[in-house]
Amino acid sequence: SLRGGAAGGGTRMRKGLDKNEVLSLAKTMEVKFTVSGPAIGGAKSGINFDPKDPRKEGVLKRWFAAVSPLLKNYYGTGGDLNVDEIHEVIPITEESGVWHPQEGVFTGHFTPTEADKINRIGQLRQGVVKIIENVNFSPDVVRKYTVADMITGYGVSESINHYYRLYGG
């Protein structure tokens, strides 16, 4: 769904993935953004392909090249099941001319000036791949976790905490 000029949701890949699963996930993203913001629509990219197949990279390159006009203007994506944001989504979308996989959300929802877009997307590009070096913000600085790793990990850990608050354990 397109809302507030944009929509967001990750890109997943698995053998047997079908349209109904992708639509359901997109609806879930719509609810997520309605509750937590920003006020945008929900989306999801789904690729019915075995992620263990050695042709995976080529499939992702063709997919992101095909959707790059959307990613430049109103769709934002990231990693999801079997698709890594740092090692696959960011570099492959960049090869397709997309500054960052969230460029479309920023462009469509905020309608920035070109200068503001360059500045903000530049900050985003540097921020999510930044390796956390401060022991106060990383469980293990030797493992070289990125900001993106910690954001994902925080969401997972909060979900687990919530489950235990509801059901004990």
Where are the regions that the model predicts?
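Glycine/serine-rich phosphate-binding loop and adjoining beta1-alpha1 elements at the start
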Residues: 34-168
